[in-house]
Every structure is written in structure tokens, then in C-alpha cells.
Regions:
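Short, contiguous acidic/charged loop-to-helix segments that flank catalytic cores in large enzymes
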Residues: 8-12, 25, 37-41, 61-62, ...
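Catalytic cores of extracellular degradative/oxidative enzymes
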Residues: 8-11, 47, 80
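Conserved helix-turn-beta segment immediately C-terminal to the redox Cys motif
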Residues: 15-37, 51-52, 103-110
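Conserved hydrophobic/aromatic "anchor" residues
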Residues: 5-6, 32, 49, 57, ...
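Thiol/disulfide oxidoreductase modules built on the thioredoxin-like
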Residues: 15, 51-56, 62-108
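Thiol-based oxidoreductase modules, predominantly thioredoxin-like and allied folds used
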Residues: 29-45, 55-66
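Short active-site neighborhood of thiol/selenol oxidoreductases, capturing the structured segment around
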Residues: 1-11, 20
Length: 110
């Protein structure tokens, strides 16, 4: 599973969306999925961004005032933060972006 912590106002986050869509389209299924986790955002802007960016992979919206925020659980200080998890739930790598992210997913899906 590739988990992307993002927000609608984050330019670098939006820059990774085409890569995430590409990976979901290529590998999405029983053994792999992209999961977006929208943080530090407003719900209306999050929903609008899904349409504007053409995001079809699963999403979780975490309200700004959520006290049990996943960003704290995973020690996320900035976004985008893209983390690849193995089938056992263990983090394989964090801070993934661009071609390096695509190459790593491709390698792990062989």
C-alpha cells in the first residue's frame, strides 16, 4: 500500500497526484493500492480537489480538529509525505516522490 498524506492547498502534493494515479492504474488491485490521506485541509476544498485533480483512488479525510491525527502517529511534519507499506504493514520507505517512487513500487510489485 502506498499512502499519500496531502492537502488541496499543497502545490508539491498536487504535483505527485499524476504519479499516484499512474501507479494505481498500473498496479491497483488485490496486492496494491494507493490511499490518499487528506490532512490539515477544509472538507469542501478536499472534495473539490478530488474532482479537479481526477483522483479516483481511495481517500480518507481527517478533519483539522481531529485529536488522534494520523500525522502524529506517523511523525509527519510536512506534506507531501508518501509512505510505502509492505503486505505485513511494515514501512518499506517514506519520503517517496517522483520517478524514485515509481521505480520502487515497480520493483516491489515484481
Amino acid at each position: 500500500m502506498l499512502v499519500d498524506f496531502w492537502a488541496s492547498w499543497c502545490g508539491p502534493c498536487k504535483g505527485e497526484i499524476p504519479n499516484l494515479i499512474e501507479l494505481q492504474n498500473k498496479f491497483g488491485g488485490e496486492k496494491f493500492t494507493v490511499l490518499g490521506v487528506n490532512v490539515w485541509d477544509e472538507e469542501e476544498k478536499f472534495k473539490a480537489a478530488l474532482t479537479e485533480e481526477g483522483i479516483t483512488y481511495p481517500q480518507i479525510y481527517i478533519p483539522r480538529d481531529n485529536k488522534d491525527n494520523a500525522t502524529e502517529l506517523y511523525g509527519i511534519q510536512g506534506i507531501p509525505q508518501i509512505i510505502l507499506f509492505g503486505p505485513d504493514g511494515v514501512i518499506i520507505q517514506r519520503d517517496l516522490r517522483g520517478q524514485a517512487m515509481k521505480d520502487l513500487v515497480e520493483e516491489k510489485m515484481k
